[in-house]
From Swiss-Prot:
The active site is at residues 247, 269. HAMAP family: Siroheme_synth. Keywords: Cobalamin biosynthesis, Lyase, Methyltransferase, Multifunctional enzyme, NAD, Oxidoreductase, Phosphoprotein, Porphyrin biosynthesis, S-adenosyl-L-methionine, Transferase. One of its GO terms (molecular function) is precorrin-2 dehydrogenase activity. Its EC number is 2.1.1.107, 1.3.1.76, 4.99.1.4. It catalyses: uroporphyrinogen III + 2 S-adenosyl-L-methionine = precorrin-2 + 2 S-adenosyl-L-homocysteine + H(+); precorrin-2 + NAD(+) = sirohydrochlorin + NADH + 2 H(+); siroheme + 2 H(+) = sirohydrochlorin + Fe(2+). CDD domains: SUMT. PANTHER family: SIROHEME SYNTHASE, SIROHEME SYNTHASE-RELATED. This is Siroheme synthase 1. NCBIfam families: cobA_cysG_Cterm, cysG_Nterm, PRK06136.1, PRK10637.1.
Amino acid sequence: MEYLPLFAQLKQRPVLVVGGGEVALRKIALLRRAGACVSVVAKKLHPELAALEQEGALRWLAQSFEPAQLDAVFLVIAATSDAALNRRVFDEANARQRLVNVVDDQPLCSFIFPSIVDRSPLIVAISSSGNAPVLARLLREKIESLLPASLGRMAEVAGGFRDRIKARIPTTDGRRRFWEKAFRGRFASLMAAGDTRAAEAVLEAELDAPQGPQGEIILVGAGPGDAGLLTLRGLQVMQQADVVLYDHLVSDGVLDLVRRDADRICVGKRAGAHAVAQHETNQMLIDFAREGKTVVRLKGGDPFIFGRGGEELEAAKAAGVPFQVVPGVTAASGATAYAGIPLTHRDYAQSAVFVTGHYKPDSEPFDWALLAKSRQTLAIYMGTMKAAEISQQLIAHGRDATTPVAVISRGTREDQRVLTGTLDTLNILAKDAPMPALLVVGEVVQLHQQLAWFQHSTDAENLRSSVVNLA
């Protein structure tokens, strides 16, 4: 081990920075976050440093470096472009046994700065000992994506309970078990949801009368297909799951991100064909949660946009089971973006309407006159089976038969297909489109050829011709 990782307490400690340029600015920003009292030795200051000096946030010594400036400081940073001056600062600091860092010159450093993941008071530091700083930065980015922002506040709350828990639980093993349960259970979930008061109440209750494991249901939007569109929060939750109930619309790439030892159960639905009845899915969610498990309900797109997520949470609420919701990128947003079709555009559409083509038989019929208005974009989910009716009704209620339309199949995935045509050919386009598919109606569709960027997007005009010819 070339370096011993240490965390320095710099609050109100004097730190000297030699240099007043952009490199010094970056280091000073870090030092100020740690509460250091910063003095800067430089003839000139970067404008942002000058502003900080005017605010009294740092002390400026507008002079040349002198060894006496090191006498009362805790550590030193040399951040100049003058190699001889940097060497002199290093030698003088070493002679006085001061910690010193010459920026980007590892041999002239008695300490180095790591890459930092800041969830204060929780801090993660990553270092390659100066050998591969880019690798350390990439590792930091990965860790950033895995650690929720709520960890810092959770650590603060836990710190506030330490003395009480130590007094109530005398053994080290007992305290370790208490905190492991807290950090893996309902306390952590409530902190992630921002409900500090309820989280503290959970710790209080656990101290007064230890409970069995408490489960919960977390509704997660998996996005339209491309695993890269999964939210960070969604990924974090999937890594904590004991059980995952997922739909057919969830892509293999997203499922691959689920915790390896979590149980996976497909409760998939397609229009008119349910692998598991909705009431059975609701009961499974409740039963698993009552066993103390973290149950992730993974749904394609966004769970609250034609995903029946509201019905599932109504059942959970009625059963007294706690739950959370993690929104996702809905198909109307993701698929159109990957197809180069903006939902709104000042020249073509001032509004966008999301509609489901698979509605309850006893529900009120669509307001076709409203949907047929021009200068708006219709995004129709689960509409391929009713494409003929949709086309006929829109035309009958005033939408021009030559209105551009698109059928986006398996949007955002590697095998995405985009078929374009006009409203009077919508049924032909939709007839053989691979599922899942989104129907888009509106003048914005004509921008597809110009704005298509996704490498798997198909030549729209050729596809349109082939589909029409097949008909």
